[in-house]
């Protein structure tokens, strides 16, 4: 928790200091009230006291009350500002750090867990700071100040109060020791519930199609019940705290008055003034003792929240302190243009026992088309994911424009690439916003938008929309078909006017006619652009300048369609499974 608080900005620190000053003032006025109460008690029990003097003391007490209330309001405002400002800063840092993470780090944490840490965990921190600035600071100051005030009044009464404080401290520590491990369990269960819910909602159509509602409900019910039972155990412990505190506070008040009565009885009946003074001290002592108890009650409220906040802080720090394996280089310019080269590249996924890719070497030049084909799981997507550095090669070098991709600045490398993912991803917003997504050196004009949509073969359905390119796309593109999503994803890559286009099985959702028109348009209008196409269809790749055939992570064939039909059995088998010998001739 302290490690996280060290990230607080100067503005938040200043507001926290001001809040502390206001708390000091508030405590001063609160603890001044019993002194006036002593004077008032003495006046009421002393013959000949003037009404004006009594009213004067009463007005001073009213002034202290109003001043304390005003300072409390100011402290509440500042604590809320501090907490919200700090949570905003941490949320920004956390989100930006997550955005810098590579695929490896994302897999280690999981998306539902990262969402929980960015939302729920930060809310826990915000609550503890807001409450803490008002209570954690106020409680010990008030308790210590009140103890100092009562120390010289009666050692017997002080001993009773001290005994109560010790008992409460032991009780609170026991509750915290029991509850903190359970809060960690609750946070992990929250991640699990988010994961199951996200999986269920994302695949809701599949769930309905396979009549799997009961199975999914049972799957969700297990972590949900575990969370309920764990939280109930904690709530039972917390339910004991306030009654115990109330019983203790009332018992302490009763003990003070009983002991005070005993002490008063021991004073001689003739010493009336001494009895009045002692009675006044008992009343004031009871008030101060109540302040001590109230301080501990406030601390108890914080301690009820603190374990969850502590776990949340650990989870946030875990993400912020996670090193990103993909480090940015310093090169901002390539030696060539439009070239991609793999030199003896091997790759192994983290924690895997075998290589996913083994000793891959090839080079394509500006304007050429490279196709990659192979069975499912042969490593096609893995191979092209090394170009934009979703992962880094375990061995060998991946070069773009003659420079190792590890040496490039991220902006420089990404500006050279137009990447179309295997699974089309669209974002909530208009078609125009999706096509011109991200930062690019390419102009964002209506003409460029039209060209990208035409070339991607998306014009057919975009022109039919009432709002055209201003038509709003829902989250993840749920209001357009798979083929439409794929074409808009391709338009997004084309709008960047990159040197190198990478298509990761991006034509799979297109019909054969649209596929052919798209490839024809790419060859005609983007003759100088290097194209890398991962595909399953022979018809999509047969006219490529170079085709790589992958099998279990190894390049078992490389050449043109005609060359591979002659000397690569794997390619020939794939080709004949899709087209007849006459069609392949």
Per-range role (PLM):
Residues 50, 149-163, 233-314, 319-320:
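Helix-loop-helix
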Residues 10, 100-104, 120-129, 133, ...:
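An intracellular "coupling" helix at the cytosolic face of ABC transporter transmembrane type-1 domains
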Residues 14-36, 57, 61, 76-80, ...:
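Alpha-helical segments in transporter systems
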Residues 11, 15-28, 32, 130-186, ...:
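Transmembrane helices of ABC transporter permease
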Residues 10, 14-74, 78, 151-156, ...:
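Transmembrane helix-loop-helix hairpins at lipid-water interfaces of multipass membrane proteins
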Residues 335-585:
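ABC-type nucleotide-binding domain
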Residues 21-22, 29-42, 55, 64-111, ...:
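Juxtamembrane helix-loop junctions of ABC transporter transmembrane domains
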């Amino acid at each position: 928790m302290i490690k996280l608080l060290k990230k607080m900005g100067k503005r938040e620190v200043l507001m926290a200091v001001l809040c502390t000053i206001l708390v000091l003032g508030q405590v001063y006025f609160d603890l001044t009230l019993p002194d006036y109460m002593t004077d008032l008690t003495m006046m009421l029990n002393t013959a000949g006291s003037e009404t004006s003097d009594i009213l004067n003391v009463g007005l001073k007490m009213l002034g202290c009350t109003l001043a304390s209330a005003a300072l409390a309001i100011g402290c509440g405002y500042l604590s809320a500002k501090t907490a919200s400002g700090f949570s905003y800063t941490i949320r920004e840092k956390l989100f930006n750090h997550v955005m810098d993470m590579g695929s490896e780090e994302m897999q280690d944490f999981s998306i539902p867990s990262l969402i929980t840490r960015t939302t729920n965990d930060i809310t826990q921190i915000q609550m503890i700071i807001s409450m803490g600035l008002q209570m954690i600071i106020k409680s010990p100051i008030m308790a210590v100040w009140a103890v100092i005030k009562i120390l010289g009044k009666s050692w017997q009464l002080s001993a009773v109060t001290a005994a109560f404080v010790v008992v409460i401290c032991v009780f609170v520590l026991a509750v915290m020791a029991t509850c903190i491990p359970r809060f960690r369990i609750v946070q992990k269960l929250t991640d699990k519930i988010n994961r199951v819910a996200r999986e269920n909602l994302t695949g809701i159509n599949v769930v309905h199609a396979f009549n799997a509602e009961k199975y999914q409900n049972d799957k969700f019910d297990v972590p949900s019940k575990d969370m309920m039972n764990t939280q109930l155990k904690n709530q039972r412990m917390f339910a004991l705290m306030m009654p115990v505190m109330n019983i203790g506070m009332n018992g302490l008040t009763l003990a003070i008055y009983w002991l005070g009565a005993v002490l008063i009885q021991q004073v001689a009946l003739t010493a009336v003034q001494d009895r009045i003074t002692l009675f006044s001290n008992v009343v004031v002592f009871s008030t101060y003792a109540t302040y001590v108890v109230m301080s501990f009650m406030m601390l108890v409220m914080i301690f009820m929240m603190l374990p969850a906040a502590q776990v949340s802080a650990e989870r946030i720090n875990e993400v912020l302190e996670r090193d990103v394996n993909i480090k940015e280089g310093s090169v901002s310019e390539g030696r060539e243009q439009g070239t991609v080269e793999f030199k003896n590249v091997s790759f192994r996924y983290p924690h895997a026992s075998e290589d996913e890719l083994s000793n891959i070497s090839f080079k394509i030049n500006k304007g050429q088309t490279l196709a990659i084909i192979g069975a499912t799981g042969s490593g096609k997507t893995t191979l092209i994911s090394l170009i934009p550095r979703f992962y880094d090669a375990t061995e060998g070098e991946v070069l773009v424009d003659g420079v190792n991709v590890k040496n490039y600045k991220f902006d420089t490398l990404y500006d050279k690439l137009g990447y179309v993912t295997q699974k089309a991803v669209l974002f909530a917003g208009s078609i125009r916003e999706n096509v011109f997504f991200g930062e690019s050196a390419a102009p964002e004009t209506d003409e460029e938008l039209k060209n990208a949509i035409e070339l991607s073969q998306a014009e057919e359905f975009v022109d039919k929309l009432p709002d055209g390119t201003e038509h709003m796309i829902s989250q993840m593109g749920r209001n357009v078909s798979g083929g439409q999503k794929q074409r808009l994803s391709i338009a997004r890559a084309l709008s960047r006017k990159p040197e190198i286009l990478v298509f990761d099985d991006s034509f799979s959702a297109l019909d054969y006619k649209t596929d052919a028109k798209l490839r024809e348009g790419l060859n005609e209008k983007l003759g100088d652009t290097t194209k890398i196409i991962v595909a399953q269809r022979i018809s999509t790749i047969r006219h490529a300048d170079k085709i790589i055939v992958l099998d279990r992570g190894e390049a078992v064939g490389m050449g043109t369609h005609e060359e591979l039909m002659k000397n690569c059995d794997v390619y020939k088998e794939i080709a004949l499974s899709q087209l007849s010998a006459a069609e392949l001739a």
